[in-house]
A protein has these predicted regions:
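Short, small/polar residue-rich loop motifs at catalytic or cofactor-binding pockets
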Residues: 2-4, 116-117
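A short beta-strand-loop-beta hairpin characteristic of the jelly-roll/cupin
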Residues: 108-142
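Short, well-structured hydrophobic secondary-structure segments
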Residues: 27-77
Length: 176
């Protein structure tokens, strides 16, 4: 699935303008069937205005302090199994290639559980998903619900039969 992304910027004389109007393809990962990532915008530092609205470099999935990421991810149902012929090393290499830095945050002994040095703002667009925290609590979220995560250890679990779409904004933060 593609998502349309309209980006504004400034002309040389300071007027607002549409800098780009494009479609962003989903990033899919073989080891995460039913899951999609749309990396819509991001930067590794705070922007300065006026600017032309051009895309900034933001290669890593998680932003550094002062950086940000904006996107949509689709959490596939937990019932959709990984392919039986999956080569784990090849799959991890694909994950690192398509979403740099995310694999190092995932816990091998607890699939999906991860921690990042970010404050995460999430809004559930459609479907339902469970936010699992490391104290054992699970919070069911449905379309219209929001989450603010403050660098917490968590996982997303989709116990339903339908995909769940979530809009997110990650902002890099300090951890003591």
């Amino acid at each position: 699935m593609k998502i349309r992304r309209v980006v504004t910027g400034h002309t040389p004389d300071g007027k607002a303008t549409v800098a780009s109007d494009t479609e962003v393809d989903a990033i899919t990962i073989r080891m995460l069937p039913g899951t999609e990532f749309h990396r819509l915008w991001g930067a590794d530092e705070a922007p300065t205005f006026p600017d032309a609205g051009s895309s900034r470099s933001a290669p890593a999935y998680f932003p550094p302090v002062g950086g940000f990421r904006f996107g949509v991810f689709t959490v596939g149902p937990d019932s959709v199994a990984m392919p039986k012929d999956l080569d784990l090393q090849v799959a991890l290499a694909e994950l690192e290639d398509k979403l740099p830095g995310i694999a190092s945050r995932l816990e091998a002994d607890n699939p999906g559980m991860h921690t990042s040095d970010t404050i995460d703002f999430e809004y559930v667009l459609s479907g339902e998903v469970w936010l699992e925290l490391d104290d054992g609590r699970e919070v069911q979220l449905r379309a219209g619900d929001t989450v603010v995560q403050n660098g917490t250890r968590h996982a997303w679990r989709n116990k339903s039969a339908a995909p769940c779409r979530v809009v997110f904004c990650l902002i890099g933060a300090h951890r003591r």
